[in-house]
């Protein structure tokens, strides 16, 4: 499969992840028939699960610069293709954030300053958690996400179950950390909404690149070491 086609798949997949995950948080979480935190967590997991079946055979279904980077560290993805994948993922996330904005702004009383499901810490943490807490959360959650991804897609793992394991892992990660940072573990997912919100969301965006990338490197290296045959 050509790199261009794989980039296209990553763009579409990341678009779906942000549209489904952030879209559910913005449009469906707090309405009278709202789905709440549990629903948002499952929405993120379902986007990955569905796209893993849809495009996993095309691009690997990374949908996340941190995942791509972690797979490079883990020896599962060529470093020369990292930047093209990241570019495609970020574009997909920005397009999805734009669609969410267009829909959400069609309702009276919509305020962009509310965040468009942006990630944040301190005053912009859903639970008021500090920068330090947010950093630890994002590093650890991303590291564990990479362990699950690499383990579930290992040739020695049970065949056909990887999308389910990975989707449920992302759901669990959101259940744990939505109160802390609104859950990133994905720099592209954070970038899309932040570009529309501006202000505080852009000022705090650095954390949601730095921490997930560190966590991904830890997770990729950890699984590579654990899985190495003697």
From Swiss-Prot:
Homology family: Belongs to the MIP/aquaporin (TC 1.A.8) family.
Complex and partners: Homotetramer.
Entry annotated with the keyword Cell membrane: yes
Entry function: Channel that permits osmotically driven movement of water in both directions. It is involved in the osmoregulation and in the maintenance of cell turgor during volume expansion in rapidly growing cells. It mediates rapid entry or exit of water in response to abrupt changes in osmolarity.
One GO cellular component term: plasma membrane
UniProt site (Selectivity filter): 44, 174, 183, 189
UniProt-annotated location(s): Cell inner membrane
Organism of this sequence: Pseudomonas putida (strain ATCC 47054 / DSM 6125 / CFBP 8728 / NCIMB 11950 / KT2440)
Keyword set includes Secreted: no
NCBIfam families the UniProt entry points to: MIP (TIGR00861), PRK05420.1 (NF003838)
Record-given protein name: Aquaporin Z
Gene that produces this protein: aqpZ
Membrane disposition: Multi-pass membrane protein
Example GO molecular function: water channel activity
Record InterPro entries: Aquaporin-like, Aquaporin_transptr, Aquaporin_Z, MIP, MIP_CS
Chain location of the short sequence motif NPA 1 per the record: 64-66
Site (Involved in tetramerization or stability of the tetramer): 22
Keywords from the named record: Cell inner membrane, Cell membrane, Membrane, Repeat, Transmembrane, Transmembrane helix, Transport
Catalytic function, reaction form: H2O(in) = H2O(out)
Motif (NPA 2): 186-188
PROSITE patterns: MIP
Domain notes: Aquaporins contain two tandem repeats each containing three membrane-spanning domains and a pore-forming loop with the signature motif Asn-Pro-Ala (NPA).
């Amino acid at each position: 499969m050509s790199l261009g086609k794989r980039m296209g798949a990553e763009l579409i997949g990341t678009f779906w992840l942000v549209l489904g995950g952030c879209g559910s948080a913005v449009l469906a979480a707090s309405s009278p028939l709202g789905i709440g935190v549990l629903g948002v967590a499952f929405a993120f997991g379902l986007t990955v699960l569905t796209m893993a079946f849809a495009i996993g055979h095309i691009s690997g279904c990374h949908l996340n610069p941190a995942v791509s980077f972690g797979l490079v560290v883990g020896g599962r993805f060529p470093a020369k293709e990292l930047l093209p994948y990241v570019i495609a993922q970020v574009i997909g996330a920005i397009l999805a954030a734009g669609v969410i904005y267009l829909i959400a702004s069609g309702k009276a009383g919509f305020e962009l300053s509310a965040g468009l499901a942006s990630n944040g810490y301190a005053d912009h943490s859903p639970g008021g958690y500090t920068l330090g807490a947010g950093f630890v959360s994002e590093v650890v959650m991303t590291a564990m996400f990479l362990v699950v991804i690499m383990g579930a897609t290992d040739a020695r793992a049970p065949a056909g179950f990887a999308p389910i394991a990975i989707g449920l892992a992302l759901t669990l990660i959101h259940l744990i950390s939505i109160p802390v940072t609104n859950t990133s573990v994905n720099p592209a997912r954070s970038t899309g909404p932040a570009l529309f919100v501006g202000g505080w969301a852009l000022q705090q965006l650095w954390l949601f690149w730095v921490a997930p990338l560190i966590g991904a490197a830890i997770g990729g290296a950890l699984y590579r070491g654990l899985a190495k045959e003697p």
